[in-house]
Amino acid sequence: QYVIVAADSDVTTADDLKNKTIGSQLGTTGMFLSEDIEGVTAQTYNRAIDAVNDLVNGRVDAVIIDKNPAEVFNTKFEGKVKIIDGAEFGFETEEYAIALPKGSELVDQINQALEDLKADGTFDALVAQYIGE
């Protein structure tokens, strides 16, 4: 998880998030994390871009979101926002996985498909389409 704040924000620690308004996408880890911070007003959104737009427009103080979309939004809103690794706030690292039965013959095929998606630009195009809109 990453925290996105306004470029001029003084938020740098977990204590700085207390009693703030924090945006997150509905049903995500960011939503659950924000609900656990003391005094926070949690604002949820159907789309992450809406949370970040509200941040840029001063309606929320921070957005808690996954690393990849945070990096996309940092580029999209360059100079208006900054991103901070959630480890600075005590958030645990979260990874993605595809679960398969042990010894599955699909492992090599799935790994190759993922490599191909990255190599031919499909992965980046999907990120831009669904995260960076």
Where are these regions (language model features)?
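A conserved helix-loop-strand patch within extracytoplasmic ligand-binding domains
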Residues: Q1-F32, G39-A42, S104
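Sec/Tat-exported extracytoplasmic proteins
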Residues: A7, L26, E38, R59, ...
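Short helix-initiation/N-cap motifs at beta->coil->alpha
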Residues: S9-D10, L26-T29, Q43-N57, N68
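Extended ligand-binding regions for polar small-molecule ligands
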Residues: V11, K20-T21, L26-T28, E95-E133
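Short helices/loops that flank or line small-molecule/ion binding pockets
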Residues: D15-D16, D36-I37, I49-V72, K76
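Short hydrophobic/aromatic-enriched beta-strand-loop microsegments
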Residues: T41-A48, V81-D85
